[in-house]
Amino acid sequence: KRCIIDQAPAGYTEHVRDPKPFITAEGKIRFVLGAQRENLTGTCLVYEMDDLNSTPRLLGELAVQDFDNSHVFMWECPDLFQLGGKGVFIWSPQGKLREATQFQNNYHATYALGKLDGNVLNAKHIEELDYGFDFYAPQTVQNSDRILFGWVGLPDLTYPTDKYKWHS
């Protein structure tokens, strides 16, 4: 075991979390991380490595076009992949303001679908993955199929079953 990133890059707080690795078409190891800028807004950092023994290179932030990042302080559990020829980004934007028909909960599981060009996702569609109250922090794994899983139950909430020491 070794630490591959021992501090946040310049311009970011130490609130960096949830690395999600994947292999690029060129055979590079790339990973995305949720991060917080020094101005306390959330983002996603993209790193790349040639192999497991190399030092990660910061490629920059992932830009999701047309996503209102106002008041968002952290992008938790980022996941970036291609599906059916489209770029897909799944994340949980903490602090997202409520909108008329979506983002009504305290915590959200969100996806953006579009064309991925370098570190820019030209999103054609941005929406919550689930409009219920208890689905959060989704991630995917892939073998022959891509499987999505996430939390059932949210932090910082009181549930009626808490008195029985059962939650989610």
Locate each region found by the language model.
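Carbohydrate-active catalytic/glycan-binding domains of CAZyme proteins
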Residues: 1-168
